[in-house]
Amino acid sequence: MICLAALAVAVPARADEAAAVRDKPNPTLAEVPASGYVPFTGQPFFLLSDASYGTDQEAMVRLEAPGREYKDELARYGGADILVYRVPQPLDFLKAQKNLHRIDVKANYTGEGLANTLAYLWDNWTRQARRAWQRVLSFATRSKAVEAAPQFSMGDQMAAPTRFSNPPQYAPLKGYELLGRFRYPIWEAKPIAPPKDVKLEGSSSEWMPQNVGNVMIPVGKLPAGLYIVEAVIGAYRAHTLLFVSDTVAVTKGTSQGMMVWTAERKSGKPVAGSAVSWTDGVGVLASGTTQADGTAELRHVAPERSYVLGVDRAGGVFISENFYYDSEIYNTKLYAFTDRPLYRPGDDVRVKFIGRNFRSATESTAPAAGDIKLDVIDPTGAPVATTTTRLSGETGADARFTLPSNAQAGGYTLRFDYGGSTYGGAFRVAEYIKPHFDVNLSLDKAGYGTGEAIKGKISLRYPDGKPVKDGKVSVSLRAQQVTMVEGELQYAGLFPVKLEQQELTTDGDGNAALTLPAAKEPSRYVVTVFANDGAAYRVKVTRELLVARGAAPYRLSTAANFTTPGQSVSFNLQPLPAVDGVRGASAPPAKWELVRLESRTRTEGALQPDAKGSATFPVKFEQPGSYTLSVRDAAGNLLAASSHWVAGDGVQTVPGNIEIVFDRDRYQIGDTAEALITFPQPVDDALLTLERDKVERHALLSGGGDWLALQRVTPSQYRARIKIGAEFSPNMTFSALTVRDGDMVFQNAGIVVTQPALDLTVRADKAVYAPGETVTLDLSSALAGKPVPANLTVSVVDEMVYVLQPEVAPSIVDFFYHPRRNSVRTTSSQSFISYDLALSSLPGKPGGTYGRHNERGVKVLERPRRDEQDTAAWVANLQTGADGRARMTFTMPDSLARWRVTVRAVSTTGAADGIVGQRTASIRSDKALYLKWTGPSRFRESDQPRLDMVAFNQTDKDITADWIVSGAGLNINQRVTLKRGANYLHAPLSGTPALQAGIVNAELKQDDRVSDRLQTTVKLDATGWLADRESIVPLTQLQGTRLPLGLPADARDVRLRVVGNTASQFARVADDLIEYPYGCAEQTASRLIPLALAQQSLAATGARLPDGNPAGTQGVDALLRTQRQRLALLAGTNGTFGWWGELTSSSALITSYAYYADWLASRAVGISLPADNWKQVLEAYKRTSQNEPLLHRALALWFANEMGLPVATPLSGVAAELARNAKAPADAEPAPGDSLIFVAPDSPRGRQVAAILTAQLMRQVGQPVPEALVSADIAARTALANDTSPLVQSLLLMGGGRSAADPAPLLARASAAMPTMDRAVALVWLQKGLGGLQGANVAAIQPVLSAGGWQAARSTVGVPTWRWAGAQPPAALDLASTPSDVTTQSAIVSYRSRAPEASRLPITVERKLYRLEPVDAAAPKDDAKAPKRAAADVTANAGITFKAKPVKPGDTLDSNALYVDEVVLTPRQGTYRYGLVEVPLPPGAEVEATTWGIQIDGLKGEPNEGNGPQPFERRAAYEMGQLSYNQPVPTLERPTALRQLVRFSLPGRFALPPARYFRMYQPEAKALQGDGKAASYPFKVE
């Protein structure tokens, strides 16, 4: 057959014969057909080793194959080929690896060879040869041959396919000793699964399915050494390391070194002579050999990740991976704290910085002197204040800043930089608001115990003291159980559980009785009260009530936490101090109960406490174990509990856990600490260490050391005695570590050492002060009883602040000397993982498909205080002398409150250097009787209000007193009975006129002795509208020392300034802009610009201003930040600006102007903003400029260019349009006093200004000016040369068209009546034209000052001013002496007087009031399944739906009701832009700040009127004035209704001026309500 086959495939001798052979079939054997065989490839899999093994253990590796998706495919291979190699030089091999987890070993790929090919060829050739013989021999011959020789029969072999095998595709690795090779059936093996009895809900055993192919593969018991295990499935191969050693290495890594302890795997005894190397994977850091105690010290700076490699004497190899990171970083620590934790917008914040430079846990020095740059960040991340202060090593540093008056509520961050490092601090801001009625929750008892029903009363009162009748009260009660641990109440659960919901209604006295269920267990009750009077949003009050146990809590203590068997231990039971003077019920202790935890056996004994509840009783512990000792009263209520341990055989610990119990919680230097160490099983040895920044001490359990003494109690329990040295402070970690049966167990326990601290004392000369008295505090500082000098920081703060917001800053002692974290990292060689992902060695990319995959205010009720001063005193640096004493004084604020005195101290001298301390104390300001004025103090001349006062009775009984009031039309002398708390007193007016301007004197007398006196100044405004006026009086009109002023008889708020040179005129204009009352985006920006210019001028000259006038006006810096925030709040979509926030569409001019103002302001206050912040200017210009006048576009580009933005391209477009529109129709010229920018930007003068500005800007940016624009520029300059407008003249001056001597008279024409943007832009151009200003000249006059006459003050930018305090306007100005220069100076007299009111606009103004009456919502009838819930929902929503009832002239208004104030504007012709409506209000009235989702039925003019209640929406934003509110009207071209929700809380009769509409940039263009003389009807409020 072989010969025939050979002949059949013989190659012909010639090429043409070969072609002939190919063309005709083989007469004997046909060609071999394709087999369809594809070599087995496989899929990627993981191979890993996650443990090391001893020589007596079955070593195993883990293989994870993708069995879920590819089991059928991979099962063809029959499992996985496993090969085990021994590494000859293990340490050298490991050191050469870059990644010890995934070693780099080159595979020896050979492919599967020719076996399957030859088998297939043999099978095919055999079948073909047989068929060839069949053709040669007949059937009969073949049959006889088979009968004679049955072995010739083929049977089914002719049709059987070739059986292919899966031979290994990898040869053994070269250079390693192959110890064994086998194919492991991974698909038949049991997959890895958790034990059967393990059922942990939510754990991985529940949601991780068992994966077929995830198996552990045993490789046998191996001699000590390092091995490579290789796994092969088809073309995929992976390898991993396998460590076999009878030695376990434990490492303790620190920042500067590594300690290695080697121990026997079975017994835990130390192993000496092991060679260890410390490597970072790149090179060896240190090497060594373990000593007799098994330890080796390796010194080197620790990298973040490192490895310890080792070989013991038996050849066992071990490896440990170590990670190090600093738990404690010793550098300069800066402690920053504020005078109090909570502030209101506009408050001054005082910050103190104290620093220490730490070199270790206890070593520190004073920091180096340096600058601290402080940034204050609001809750949105925006900076609101920036300042720099100087840090001194001895006294620290302090800073002060003022919050913006519109600061957002929330958490604020103090971010400060010092010495290249950034630090942080915090405080909070909240607006204190008073709800429109008060909710008082008072309980019948001060404290409640378990089992007692809680009863109390909810009282609703309006500000005038009237009860809220039929008020709806929803009470929600939630409870959270608490537990007592060693006398301390702690929460036993995470979340309060809702118990019940009550719906109550107040009676005619405004009261509702409240009964809460009794608590069975000690609980924390959270009572939430929602009250609604049917005319406003609900007022929410939350009260927390601690329901303690039925008896007062006690503390159970003993001298030691553990003792020996048979010892009698004395326990001391003491009642805890009362909290706020409140104790629980007085059930005395009756018995003690002892429970042994190991056996649950109980022992009891009776107690005989003394009268105070104290007791000392012995307890004898017979058996070793863990005990809980409890003290209970006769009813079985737990009063106190404590744990105790008794050394000896029988104490059990949690398996796998070492228990360390110290005899005390805290130690003094020099003490001896005793520790009871209980191991989970008997041990032969263990490693004991003291750790903190490094391993400070170490010893073996079998040998002890010089720093501890050991005593064996049982084979698994030891007692250790440790001497506490100074180096232990503030804490040290004691660690016990043992190795047993291959497992490493260790436990840390802290030794806390009392940190020496300064002993501070605060002694007040009195315990209680009256408001206005001088408080004297004597402070002392001592250390260990000896006086030491120290630097103190003292704050005296209203205790109410800490009720609203607990202290944010940590204690100074905790900050500098808190317990240090343990920086030692403990690991073992048992936890090292080696792994590999199998990859194919076939050509191409790695194959396989495995693994492809608003703001809320803080409500404060009425309090006995006449000022808003929360910080009574703040002393940043108070130095005690060598005797340790210092004294401070301050004046007690006019408030009745409890004041917390907080003293923080640091000593920087002698042995006390670096010692800090903190102490709090309390003082009180109190009076038996205290008066407070609660209503407004500003009225109109014809008002007849009912004035109210609140008299606080601070005693515990009712008092009869005489109430005497005189002044301002009041004359009262009556006897009143004052109940405890707040009493509302109503003061009726008498005399003609009923109300007068002046001082109201009020007194409360007891037995002809004045208990309290109150003075309030009442101010009266004119009945009509007042207009701002200015009068310029040259000093040349002086008559000796008297200057006639010529003021009208109704002039009020008179202020005088003296101006002369350009700088003083500039300051006057800046002051006028800053004080302008309204606040659209343009006016806010126009206020920012002079503030920024003033701040830059002050910074350049180094001048520092006081806080302003005596009233405490904010400084320039604070005003800048306030206005910046206001401007930000007016921003619209995409950061663009319209005229008044989002009420108006975006404008390129307003956006550019607003960003320019913010750019100036941020530079002035030192705030850095990213360059991208200003790009919105150009984006807004692209979107909106095409619809704006050329003057607006030119101005927008000028502002953009000042900010450094590229403007060349849009500027050329403006120049081209100016040339095209030169002859286009123009708007009419503006009237005198009108704004050129907003009223007539397309007038001839507006286009001339645009041409001049555009040409000037093109020259400035280096762009050629077109000839047409050059001609227009020259013509415009000629035409405007004699224009008197300050805006025009400042532009010419900036362009060099006028001399520098002209600006003073130019600025004199910029009066307060000039439109704001025109004035602000004129200031900017003027300053640029003059190259800056040198500051205002000092006034050369000195008026005669008196209490009832002229009073000195300073304006916002620091200009001296004088204000008139007399009742009648001054006829003349009397000077103290004749000034030397009267020719160049003038007196500017600013005042307010009645405005000539006349309607000049064809607009009808109507004002209507609607009283809102709540509509009762009916309960759903079809909700039968949950009637209680339906009722609760109805009550909760009561007062949200209202019916609007029109108020008729003469109707009396209810001071407790809510009204809709509607103003309807109806233009009879034309369209009016930039308008403002001013709506007068009576004193005490206020606009609701929110609409709280109400619905109103009955308002006229609604699109869906008559279809039921409609959601109420404001038609415009509003701003409050003194006795009015105003609403912007961007465009008026059709009838428009403006509505607000208003309250009238002050009873009385009031005559109001008419509501009026005027155009902002044409102030004389007005429209008035009715006849323009008075409102439609007088307001009568009851």
From Swiss-Prot:
There is a cross-link at C1080-Q1083 (Isoglutamyl cysteine thioester (Cys-Gln)). Residues 1-15 form the signal peptide. One of its GO terms (molecular function) is endopeptidase inhibitor activity. Keywords: Protease inhibitor, Signal, Thioester bond. Belongs to the protease inhibitor I39 (alpha-2-macroglobulin) family. Bacterial alpha-2-macroglobulin subfamily. Protects the bacterial cell from host peptidases. It holds the Pfam family MG2. This is Alpha-2-macroglobulin. It comes from Ralstonia nicotianae (strain ATCC BAA-1114 / GMI1000) (Ralstonia solanacearum). It comes from the Bacteria.
